[in-house]
Amino acid sequence: MGYFQGNDFRKITGGKKGKHRDKRKFELGSPPTETKLSTEELIEKERGMGGNIKIRVKYATFANIYDPQEKVSKKAKILSVIETPANKEYARRGIIVKGSIIQTELGKAKVTSRPGQDGTINAILIKE
């Protein structure tokens, strides 16, 4: 079933409004991409508005970690999701979103990209 993002054809009282047109394709949405920590990577391409391509990370193993001390970026394996300020349940389920604190081979890092929108996981190393 599709995700409709237009007006819901109902009045405040609960009664039905008269439809003046059918639903359009541009009003179609999709469920949130909950990027999960996994042993294998899966990246999906999806058509967006205007024929643009949206790249979504479904399962992730590695992240691009920026070290502000050395001013260099490195690819590192993600070991675990420590904390997620957006939703405490996400950390328990291993879901990575922007702002999540992840444990990598290089140390703790804070995710700066949106994996469900950008198609990659970028993070900045946190000094302890």
Curated annotation (Swiss-Prot):
Residues 13-23 have a biased composition (Basic residues). InterPro entries: Ribosomal_eS8, Ribosomal_eS8_CS, Ribosomal_protein_eS8_arc, Ribosomal_Se8/biogenesis_NSA2. Part of the 30S ribosomal subunit. One of its GO terms (molecular function) is structural constituent of ribosome. PROSITE patterns: RIBOSOMAL_S8E. Transmembrane segments: none annotated. Belongs to the eukaryotic ribosomal protein eS8 family. GO terms for biological process: translation. Residues 1-37 are annotated as: Disordered. This is Small ribosomal subunit protein eS8. It holds the Pfam family Ribosomal_S8e. One of its GO terms (cellular component) is ribosome. Gene3D superfamilies: 2.40.10.310. It comes from the Archaea. Keywords: Ribonucleoprotein, Ribosomal protein.
